[in-house]
Amino acid sequence: MSTVTGAAGIGLATLAADGSVLDTWFPAPELTESGTSATSRLAVSDVPVELAALIGRDDDRRTETIAVRTVIGSLDDVAADPYDAYLRLHLLSHRLVAPHGLNAGGLFGVLTNVVWTNHGPCAIDGFEAVRARLRRRGPVTVYGVDKFPRMVDYVVPTGVRIADADRVRLGAHLAPGTTVMHEGFVNYNAGTLGASMVEGRISAGVVVGDGSDVGGGASIMGTLSGGGTHVISIGKRCLLGANSGLGISLGDDCVVEAGLYVTAGTRVTMPDSNSVKARELSGSSNLLFRRNSVSGAVEVLARDGQGIALNEDLHAN
């Protein structure tokens, strides 16, 4: 019996003057059986008409757009090159693969730092001369200088709302019913598994369950910096209060009080007055984390029943 462990896609790649890959857009990636990883350049006649019309050089940007077919033999392997990396990011944002459903390690090492503009991606070297030429076309807006572009410039998932496109990176996984407000942020290989409200930061690797609310200014620790290796997940119907923070995983129906940052090493007072480190409660359900306003101690209490209920009108996307 065949096993779906690979992926493939026909895309358009932007090459800089030195041949480096600035980006690759895969409009219709697909999962495949395992095979041999490779990227091949396609002739104009080998791609759909709507893509063929976009192939060619842009002398103002000093770039060339080419058609490619990329095959990933196994999603368990690390990305082999920029084409491979972009295909993986598209698989996540197209919701073909959930966060941690593929190997996202090593992406930074194969991707190029790019100047992202309203006229398309540009190389950093010589950009001021490029900017001058582009100004003949109209205003030049630089969205950022980064290795990861905005998701919506490549993938617009159905059933979601994103108030600020700059706040969601390509490679984010947004389930139908998800709303990302202006101060929300979702990194790559991270996101939601169901209808969720995102007004805080979902760092790389973090997964948020159905019906949960990441409050305004709330922060969920990731693994990209600081030497952390623990991958944090939040279960269903959880609430991270405004300006709260989380460094452990939560099960279902949990609440973290507004303004409270619970790290793995935070000492937490139990209902029986014993004190434990929060990491010992990681993954538990039906808990309320709060700070005692008199003693200042962080307390955890048991909660009965299900957690929060989202406003359905805000998630009918």
Curated annotation (Swiss-Prot):
Give the metabolic or biological pathway.
Amino-acid biosynthesis; L-lysine biosynthesis via DAP pathway; LL-2,6-diaminopimelate from (S)-tetrahydrodipicolinate (succinylase route): step 1/3
Question: What GO terms in the biological process aspect are recorded for it?
Answer: diaminopimelate biosynthetic process; lysine biosynthetic process via diaminopimelate
Q: What class of enzyme is it?
A: transferase
Domain of life the protein comes from: Bacteria
How is it regulated at the activity level? Is activated by Mg(2+), Ca(2+) and Mn(2+), and inhibited by Zn(2+) and Co(2+). Is not inhibited by EDTA in vitro.
Tell me the residue numbers annotated for binding succinyl-CoA. Answer: R201, G216, S219, A242, E257, A258, G265, K277, R290, R291, N292, S293
Per UniProt, subcellular location reads as: Cytoplasm
Recorded GO MF terms: 2,3,4,5-tetrahydropyridine-2,6-dicarboxylate N-succinyltransferase activity; magnesium ion binding; sodium ion binding; succinyl-CoA binding
In which broad location class does this protein mainly occur, judging by the first location in its UniProt entry? cytoplasm
> Where along this sequence does the record place binding of Mg(2+) 2?
E183
Q: Give the record's GO CC terms.
A: cytoplasm; peptidoglycan-based cell wall; plasma membrane
Q: So where does Mg(2+) 1 get bound?
A: D166
Xref: Pfam families? Hexapep_2 (PF14602), THDPS_M (PF14789)
Per the UniProt record, which EC number(s) apply here? Answer: 2.3.1.117
The Swiss-Prot or TrEMBL record describes its family as follows: Belongs to the type 2 tetrahydrodipicolinate N-succinyltransferase family.
Q: Which NCBIfam families match?
A: DapD_actino
Misc. comment: Was identified as a high-confidence drug target.
Self-association or partners: how does it assemble? Homotrimer.
- What name does this protein carry? 2,3,4,5-tetrahydropyridine-2,6-dicarboxylate N-succinyltransferase
- Source organism of this protein record: Mycobacterium tuberculosis (strain ATCC 25618 / H37Rv)
